[in-house]
Structure formats: structure tokens, C-alpha cells
Curated annotation (Swiss-Prot):
Organism: Murine adenovirus A serotype 1
Protein name per the record: Probable early E4 33 kDa protein
Cellular localization per UniProt: Host nucleus; Host cytoplasm
Other information: This protein is the product of two different mRNAs spliced from the same primary transcript.
Highest taxon, organism lineage: Viruses
Main localization of the protein described in the UniProt heading: host cell
Length: 289
């Protein structure tokens, strides 16, 4: 996984990340189609690697980069291209044990089998198709279980408010960065300086900045993962400096840059124990540090 910066490494120094800019506005408009009253379509088990997203309560799916043109057309006809199709309703219990489930919802305006109407069978059929598509995407979170060091290195020099959460590997590498409300709004205002391939996904539960990497090799190798996480660390540091009104990616004091954000280091230890030994994570400790 090379972040698409390997063939054009000079773009990294401009904060540019990786996708055709001509498709950006069209992509966001197609994905933002959560209209109508939602209703539950089914439940999906949560993989072990998705525990960090369970803590956030929601996981956006960039459909235009995940699906091919035919699948995207079919799901669009079925009103299935909601940007946040799954939420974790069991994410507010005291402990996260790995037995959580994701709720899959639809915006077709019907209540599935609870309401008889002209679109009832279509909704039920769409639910089965959508379950397969979303479950495959959720399985891509196993990347976080296989490469726990990725988060450690990516968040090494970042402050609270702009942190890498996890990745989804499903044909492409989808990188999820969580931003607090104020930081999220400021980053949107700096969108022109962040570069290409940066998607902003906002819901009531969380705010994500999603980076889509199109040229990472499949399957990933250890060397590619190491290179990818170094470039992400560089990018996050540059974004942080932009928010602080500084240019470049240099530390605040030249020659002196130590790891910070103790809350994030505590979360990393809890995630490591969960991935290795399935040790339950106490929610309040994880969220508050």
C-alpha cells in the first residue's frame, strides 16, 4: 500500500492525496442521498478489526470508489446509496466484547415486511443484496487487526482532535481520520489545500475525513504498509500544521518532536490487548482516556 504517492512523491509536500479531482463533486453529491425516513433492513456481525469504528458508532462507505459502475447503478435504483448505511446501536454498552452488531438501514420510505406497499418486495430484495455488499466492506476492517502498528505510527505526532481511526481494505485502501467538530469545519474550509481524494463525511455520531488510496497493491505487503503509514503520519502532521496556521510538517520546536496525546496511546494499548487476547474494552476509559 503506497498511498498513490510513490509515483508522485512530490505531491506529498503539497498535501495532495490521490484521486481525480474531476470526479470529486459528483461523487459527494451521489453519496449524499440519505433522504426519507430510515428503517432497519437487517443486522450484520461486527468483525474484530472494526472495534475502533464500533466506538465511533458509525461507518461511512464511499460507494463511488467501492463499487463498480454496474453495482452502483443497481443500488442507486434501489435507494441503497446512503453515506452512513450502518450504525452500531449496541455501541453504548459499558464494555465492547466483539459481539456487537451493525444495524443496516434503508431510506425507501417503507417499513419492509411491517408495511404492505408497492415497494415492499423491492425493499426486501434490496436488503439481501445490500447485506452482502456491506458485509464484504466490513470484513475489510481486518486490516486493523493484522497491522495494529499502523495506527501507532500514524498517530504518533498528532494532537487530539485529528486522529487516524482505522482502515478498510476492500479492493482499495480506505483510510479513516476522525476530526472533532471544530477541526472538521476548519478542514472543510481548507479543502483546496488538502489535495485530491479527501472526502468529508459527517453524521450525528461522528465526523470522518476519508482518504481513498487507489494505487495500493493487492494483497498488501509489510513493506508497503510501512511506507503507507509513514506517508499518512506525514500528511496528518501537515494538516495539523495547517490548522495551527503553520506551513510544512516540521515540529513546533526545531529538532524537538516527541510523541504526545496520552489518550491515544492508552487507546492503542487497549486495542492491542483486544486484537491479541480479546480483552473487553471499557467504553468510558476508551472515550475519555
Amino acid at each position: 500500500m503506497t498511498f498513490c504517492l510513490l509515483p508522485a512523491f512530490t505531491q506529498a509536500f503539497c498535501g495532495c492525496i490521490f484521486i481525480n479531482p474531476l470526479t470529486m463533486s459528483a461523487t459527494l453529491s451521489r453519496m449524499d442521498c440519505c433522504v426519507g425516513l430510515p428503517h432497519c433492513m437487517g443486522w450484520l456481525p461486527s468483525p474484530v478489526g472494526a472495534v475502533a469504528f464500533v466506538m465511533e458508532g458509525a461507518l461511512p462507505i464511499p460507494w463511488s470508489y467501492y463499487l463498480n459502475s454496474y453495482d452502483k447503478h443497481v443500488l442507486q435504483q434501489l435507494d441503497c446509496l446512503c453515506l452512513f448505511p450502518v450504525t452500531c446501536y449496541q455501541s453504548f454498552t459499558s464494555y465492547v466484547t466483539g459481539d456487537e452488531v451493525w444495524s443496516l438501514h434503508c431510506h425507501c420510505g417503507r417499513q419492509g415486511s411491517l408495511q404492505v406497499g408497492p415497494r415492499r418486495l423491492q425493499c426486501l430484495a434490496a436488503a439481501k443484496v445490500r447485506e452482502l455488499v456491506v458485509q464484504k466492506f466490513l470484513l475489510g476492517t481486518r486490516f486493523n487487526e493484522y497491522y495494529p502498528q499502523y495506527r501507532v505510527h500514524a498517530n504518533r505526532y498528532v494532537n487530539p482532535g485529528l486522529e487516524y481511526v482505522g482502515s478498510v481494505w476492500c479492493g482499495k485502501h480506505f483510510i479513516y481520520v476522525r476530526a472533532d467538530g471544530a477541526e472538521f469545519a476548519r478542514l472543510k474550509g481548507l479543502r483546496a489545500r488538502l489535495g485530491q481524494g479527501v472526502l468529508f463525511c459527517e453524521s450525528l455520531l461522528s465526523c470522518y475525513v476519508v482518504i481513498v488510496c487507489q494505487q495500493c497493491a493487492c494483497p498488501p505487503t509489510d513493506a508497503q504498509v510501512d511506507h503507507c503509514m509513514r506517508l499518512l503520519s506525514f500528511t496528518l502532521r501537515r494538516w495539523q500544521n495547517l490548522l495551527l496556521g503553520r506551513s510544512g510538517s516540521s515540529p513546533l520546536i526545531p529538532g524537538f518532536d516527541i510523541p504526545r496525546n496520552r489518550t491515544e496511546r492508552l487507546r492503542q494499548r487497549m486495542l492491542h490487548r483486544f486484537y491479541s487476547y480479546r480483552t473487553p474494552i471499557y467504553r468510558l476509559t476508551y472515550l475519555r482516556g
